[in-house]
């Protein structure tokens, strides 16, 4: 494995930018290839078999780009595949979210907002219970929040109303921890924190995931030894909304995005 190879980041759309941002904070000299499957987003309502197929196509494409590792920045993908089936070093956001939730909670009452597919898989429920069998896990699918992010936002009042509708019922459950079980959701963090106020710890799994990636690279002498990190953005759909959302979140209005035809993944 070439330590100077790029790190691949996969998401169904623009949400994985939240993971890229955390990685850039602690591994700024690494090269990254971000792949957003924006033509086929959202994944959350698709069957497991279809998600597996799409993921295999993207991973194989990234292998051809000589990536040294793949970061799955999509909880829906993580809940649909077995990472051991892929012959490449792979890190997953969902596992980081499970660990973060268990570490954050004091009363063992944890809320999870995610996509329909992630909720139905019960991956968070089972994972949290595996680490804390006494935990109470309350889940809710919030596909409308994914669409808000992918479409490049609406007016603030509309976003707040959608976030409130999705999250306020958790407060009645006396949760002390809320997991953002979809990488799109940290983009809406100011609105989420406004709804839950100071009563709940909001967990962004990308923080732990980024530290796990760095820890592995350091311990296995895989940290890039050349200076000056570069980022390549690849999408399968239209570029405009991706550039708008990603550019805003990364504070970079001039990101270059290349569109990849689905046929190139076959």
UniProtKB/Swiss-Prot annotation:
Q: What is its EC number?
A: 5.1.1.3
Q: Which Gene3D superfamilies would you find in this protein's record? A: 3.40.50.1860
One Pfam match, given by its short name, reads Asp_Glu_race
One MF term in the entry's GO annotations = glutamate racemase activity
Q: Which UniProt keywords apply?
A: Cell shape, Cell wall biogenesis/degradation, Isomerase, Peptidoglycan synthesis
Which residues are annotated as active site?
74 (proton donor/acceptor), 182 (proton donor/acceptor)
- Domain of life, per the record? Bacteria
Annotated substrate binding lies at 11-12, 43-44, 75-76, 183-184
Which pathway does UniProt place it in? Cell wall biogenesis; peptidoglycan biosynthesis
GO BP annotations, alphabetical order: cell wall organization; peptidoglycan biosynthetic process; regulation of cell shape
EC category name: isomerase
Output the InterPro entries linked to this UniProt entry: Asp/Glu/hydantoin_racemase, Asp/Glu_race, Asp/Glu_racemase_AS_2, Glu_race
Q: Which reaction does it catalyse?
A: L-glutamate = D-glutamate
PANTHER family per the record?
Answer: GLUTAMATE RACEMASE
Indicate the family of this protein: Belongs to the aspartate/glutamate racemases family.
> What biological function has been recorded for the protein in this entry?
Provides the (R)-glutamate required for cell wall biosynthesis.
Q: Which HAMAP family match?
A: Glu_racemase
Q: What is this protein called?
A: Glutamate racemase 1
Q: What is the lineage of its organism?
A: Bacteria, Bacillati, Bacillota, Clostridia, Thermoanaerobacterales
């Amino acid at each position: 494995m070439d330590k100077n190879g790029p790190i691949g980041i996969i998401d169904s759309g623009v949400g994985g930018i939240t993971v890229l941002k955390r990685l850039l904070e602690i591994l700024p000299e690494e090269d990254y290839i971000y792949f957003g499957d924006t033509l086929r987003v959202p994944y959350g309502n698709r069957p497991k078999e279809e998600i597996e197929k799409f993921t295999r196509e993207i991973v194989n494409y990234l292998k051809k780009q000589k990536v040294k590792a793949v970061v799955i920045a999509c909880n829906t993908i993580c809940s649909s595949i077995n990472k051991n089936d892929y012959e490449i070093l792979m890190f997953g956001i969902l596992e980081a979210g499970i660990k973060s939730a268990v570490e954050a909670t004091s009363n063992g009452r944890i809320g999870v907002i995610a996509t329909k597919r992630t909720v139905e898989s019960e991956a968070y429920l089972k994972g949290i219970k595996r680490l804390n069998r006494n935990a109470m896990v309350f889940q809710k699918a919030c596909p409308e929040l994914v669409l808000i992010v992918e479409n490049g936002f609406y007016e603030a009042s509309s976003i707040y109303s959608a976030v409130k509708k999705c999250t306020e019922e958790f407060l009645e459950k006396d949760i002390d921890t809320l997991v953002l079980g979809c990488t799109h959701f940290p983009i809406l963090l100011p609105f989420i924190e406004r709804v839950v106020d100071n009563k709940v710890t909001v967990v962004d799994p990308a923080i732990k995931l980024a530290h796990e990636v760095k820890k592995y690279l350091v311990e296995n002498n895989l940290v890039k030894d050349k200076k000056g990190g570069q980022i390549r953005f690849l999408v399968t759909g239209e570029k405009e909304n991706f550039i708008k959302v990603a550019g805003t979140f990364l504070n970079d209005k001039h990101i270059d995005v290349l569109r990849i035809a689905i046929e190139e993944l076959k």
